[in-house]
Amino acid sequence: MIREEEVFKIGQFAKPHGIKGELSLVTNSDVLEDAEDPYIVCEMDGILVPFFVEDFRYKTDTVVLVKLEDVNSEEDARMFVGKEVFYPLDAVDEEDLVGDMTWDSFIGYTVTDVQKGYLGEITDVDETTINVLLRVDHKGEELLIPAVEELITEADHEARSLTVSLPEGLIDL
């Protein structure tokens, strides 16, 4: 059985494409490109289920048309609409992982500062500003942390945690 900590979110299925079972996957990830036998994972009835990717092609920079094995009609594809799409951590080299993940993938991660210690859990990501911000529940208050790789000293995807080195005074704002 696949566990939640063994996968990370790469996107979401939007809608069927055509009548042969293809689906539009909205994603910023390119993990399927490097996979020899790619498969994705979706939650179905509360269980994480793997689905083998028969074929895929890019429609735009952020939309990939995906054909899953045994999904052969528009009707079959409709059951995937709106489903979040995950990818197995063990199928990606650890050093490549951060670059392939979207910031939304970090929701639910814990955040620890190298000086201040445990800060809280990432509850949301704000992409409405020029700089992407991680929203962290810090002792019942919202802490906004710029989502820049220079501040992140370690990302442990299996433990779902980030270690950051924040500038002096940022936590006090």
From Swiss-Prot:
It is found in: Cytoplasm. It comes from Parabacteroides distasonis (strain ATCC 8503 / DSM 20701 / CIP 104284 / JCM 5825 / NCTC 11152). GO terms for molecular function: ribosome binding. Its main location: cytoplasm. Belongs to the RimM family. Residues 98-170 form the PRC barrel domain. NCBIfam families: 16S_RimM. The gene is rimM. This is Ribosome maturation factor RimM.
